[in-house]
Amino acid sequence: NVVGIAADCGYSSPRAIIRKVLKDRHLPVALYPLVRLGAILFAHFDPDSVGADTALERCRIPVLLVHGDDDRFVPCDMSREMYRRCGSKDKELLIVPTAGHGASYLVDYDRYRKTVSDFVRRTLHPEG
């Protein structure tokens, strides 16, 4: 009985973040099929079979996405894209300027706390 989704610095899909990490490590993206095969064989998981971006298209519950615009690990554009594709009528995107990965609450604690608190209150107690 999930009533809402809140994600801080979420990536859009395993495939997208793996390819980004390969590039960041100066490894050829052509290695992706090998990484995928390793995930399938050893983790029993296919990175191409799932993604938050496509799952959110069918989402009908409240969604809060938070991201620092200076995140160098998970690009902020991934949250922007998930927000754009999200099918929920109750969706919110908080972008925190100058915040790195997982640091939005440190950079703008008051705004972060208010946004998350309001979301939780609204989601858990929709009648007011």
Residue ranges and their predicted role:
Residues N1-D46, T54, I61:
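Hydrolase active-site cap/lid region
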Residues R80-S104, Y109, T115:
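Catalytic histidine neighborhood in serine/cysteine hydrolases
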